[in-house]
UniProtKB/Swiss-Prot annotation:
The gene is coaD. Its main location: cytoplasm. This is Phosphopantetheine adenylyltransferase. GO terms for biological process: coenzyme A biosynthetic process. PANTHER family: PHOSPHOPANTETHEINE ADENYLYLTRANSFERASE (PTHR21342:SF1).
Length: 162
């Protein structure tokens, strides 16, 4: 079975993330979305909320894949891959600046565990998009409806409600 992981903090998941996950699901038998736990980072959504948001977003996508599972991970991503028998990491690249960092990570992951990294170019309509940008725009009452799945939009609105 060809298995891949799409890692990230997904705080929150964006339409750009979702696009990469759905596209990866067409290339692999199973795609595991690994929600990375970083306790030193302040998150808007809890790990459980992020997992639920991702599951709901994938399920409600027009091309809803049935081969996507969501899990959480702390520690080294290659250890997560090794324990679960995952051979590939899928990463979306928005710009050349992403490539510099991601290439170093890919080389390290390969040297540590022989895990391959597949880079997918982001759909141009999402090239500027990041979770941080979504949170910033939403924090000031901006419209993020075209940037995140509906379930995330509801979650963001619930967070900003008085």
């Amino acid at each position: 079975m060809r298995r891949a992981v799409c890692p990230g903090s997904f705080d929150p998941i964006t339409n750009g993330h979702l696009d990469i996950i759905v596209r990866a699901s067409k290339l692999f038998d199973e795609v595991v979305v690994a929600v990375l736990i970083n306790k030193s980072k302040a998150h808007l959504f809890t790990i459980e909320e992020r997992i639920d948001l991702i599951r709901d977003a994938v399920r409600s996508h027009p091309d809803a894949p049935t081969n996507v599972v969501v899990d959480s991970s702390h520690g080294l991503l290659v250890d997560f891959c090794r324990v679960r028998g995952i051979q590939s990491i899928v990463k979306g690249l928005r710009a050349v600046s992403d490539f510099d960092y991601e290439l170093q990570m890919a080389q390290m992951n390969h040297s540590l565990a022989g895990v391959e990294t597949l880079f997918m170019s982001t759909n141009p309509q999402y090239a500027f998009l990041s979770s941080s940008l979504v949170k910033e725009v939403a924090r000031y009452g901006g419209d993020v409806s075209g940037l995140v799945p509906d379930v995330v939009l509801k979650g963001l609105r619930d967070r900003s409600a008085p």
